[in-house]
Regions:
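Low-complexity, small/basic-enriched stretches
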Residues: 1-67, 132-165, 172-173
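Nucleic acid-binding interface residues in structured DNA/RNA-binding domains
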Residues: 9-16, 65-164
Length: 173
């Protein structure tokens, strides 16, 4: 899993699938990390971080909640395009790596790599990008806890296609 231990987090938020480490500048979210089991939640250290946490908690209660916090997404031009395309996928829907690649005139593997490099998962919904015949990957893994988190997020949004509900194989993001 993409776990980080020694980051300077502005908050550590308890969520149904673990603890999220929230990184932000004064006025933009720069990262969300899935923290290792046993990590303790920590209150937000700024008003902006409190807003980020409140919006995440609101989304976790109501999948139709909208995020309005500014994001600072740093990456290659291709990754930027993929992340923007993911932000355009409506809640309750998914796109395959191939479909997104076709829209962006790219290839499925490059889309999967951009999904895996997404610095702000949950808000930038890489979980909505799935394999052609399965869930695909999540956090650079194709099985285990990361796929359980992806499955949880998709089920929460009522987006998980029933053939994929128990599926854990795939590639990419």
């Amino acid at each position: 899993m993409r776990y980080h231990r020694r980051m300077d987090y502005q908050a550590k938020l308890k969520v149904p699938f673990g603890v999220l480490g929230i990184r932000c500048t004064g006025d933009a979210v720069t990262g969300i990390d899935f923290l290792p089991a046993g990590e303790k939640p920590r209150r937000a250290t700024s008003a902006f971080a409190e807003t980020v946490c409140a919006q995440l908690l609101h989304y976790l209660e109501n999948p139709d909640a909208q995020f309005s916090v500014p994001l600072e997404l740093n990456g290659t031009p291709h990754r930027q395009k993929v992340w923007q395309a993911m932000l355009a996928i409506p809640r309750g829907q998914t796109r395959s790596y191939g479909e997104l690649a076709s829209e962006l005139k790219s290839c499925a593997q490059a889309v999967g790599q951009a999904c895996g490099a997404n610095p702000i998962p949950v808000i930038v919904p890489c979980h909505r990008v799935v394999g052609k015949a399965g869930l695909g990957g999540f956090m650079k893994h194709a099985s285990g806890d990361p796929l359980d988190i992806k499955r949880w997020l998709l089920a929460h949004e009522h987006a998980i296609p029933s053939p994929l509900a128990g599926e854990g194989q795939g590639r990419g993001g």
